[in-house]
Curated annotation (Swiss-Prot):
The keyword Membrane applies. Keywords: ATP synthesis, Cell inner membrane, Cell membrane, CF(1), Hydrogen ion transport, Ion transport, Membrane, Transport. Its main location: membrane. SUPFAM superfamilies: N-terminal domain of the delta subunit of the F1F0-ATP synthase (SSF47928). It is a peripheral membrane protein. InterPro entries: ATP_synth_OSCP/delta_N_sf, ATPase_OSCP/dsu. The lineage of its organism: Bacteria, Pseudomonadati, Campylobacterota, Epsilonproteobacteria, Campylobacterales. F-type ATPases have 2 components, F(1) - the catalytic core - and F(0) - the membrane proton channel. F(1) has five subunits: alpha(3), beta(3), gamma(1), delta(1), epsilon(1). F(0) has three main subunits: a(1), b(2) and c(10-14). The alpha and beta chains form an alternating ring which encloses part of the gamma chain. F(1) is attached to F(0) by a central stalk formed by the gamma and epsilon chains, while a peripheral stalk is formed by the delta and b chains. Belongs to the ATPase delta chain family. The keyword Transferase does not apply. F(1)F(0) ATP synthase produces ATP from ADP in the presence of a proton or sodium gradient. F-type ATPases consist of two structural domains, F(1) containing the extramembraneous catalytic core and F(0) containing the membrane proton channel, linked together by a central stalk and a peripheral stalk. During catalysis, ATP synthesis in the catalytic domain of F(1) is coupled via a rotary mechanism of the central stalk subunits to proton translocation. Pfam families: OSCP. One of its GO terms (cellular component) is plasma membrane. This is ATP synthase subunit delta.
Amino acid sequence: MEELIAKRYLKAIKQGSNAESMREIALIFSILSEAFNDKKFIQIINNPDVSRDQKSEILLAAVKSAGYKEVENLIKLLAEHNRIEIIPAIAEVMRKDIAKTNRVYSGVVYSDSVVDSKVMEDLGNGLGSRFNSKISLKFVKDNFNGIKVDVEDLGVEISFSKARINTQMIEHIIKAI
């Protein structure tokens, strides 16, 4: 639900912004969304004793130095309609939209053994050429017996399981005999 509402706000922001200002606004919202990881901040935002104007002033003080009237007006609008809690969703929708526009994505490689950086680069380049985009991959050590590549924004997940490959090889050998 939050994502649908965030997309509406994104559409409005995109109409009045160019690509460079979109990146800067996305950065501002990304930083604001990090504040929602702080329990004390969430207590203040969810506290019914704190007025909408006070919540708005707290957020406006955080973004005042950026000097974007659009951001300030959006924060006032969000506070007015009690939608401050969707700021992280707006930040995520903006990040995905910018990635889609620039065709630059990030993904994760999961494996139980260390994957060489050259292999990671080759995987990223191969996937990037397949999807006509630039994909950067980072490694996460996991208990997955094989290699799994996940590029969430593209909706791509590729996995190579050692057990499955062994099973397929055995089946192929049995068929050959």
